[in-house]
Amino acid sequence: MFVTSGAGSKAEMSAYMGAYAASKAALDALARTYAAETATTSSVRVMVANPGPLRTNMRAALMPGEDPMILHTPEDFAPKVVAMCAPEWTETGRFYDFQNGGVKSFRAPA
């Protein structure tokens, strides 16, 4: 389970967050590669999840004028992560978008 961010694929969202955006872009590339490497050789499942904007201290520091009450909390996101880590989860090599509530193919790199 890899937790990513839109900052890894959208430079316009990442002003003043270069190191963070670069780390998430690298994480996305690593996950795509690992999924391809293990797709037919292992029972390892690889999922990438983007929680989108969450009510965190980091978000509050970056967006000081934003109303935190309009955002989901990490506790809202956690059950989805737990579900994707459970033995019953069968998908691999996919991307989960928490804000839109869907699993899809990995997005193309920016």
Residue locations for each model-derived region?
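Catalytic loop of short-chain dehydrogenase/reductase
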Residues: 1-40, 53
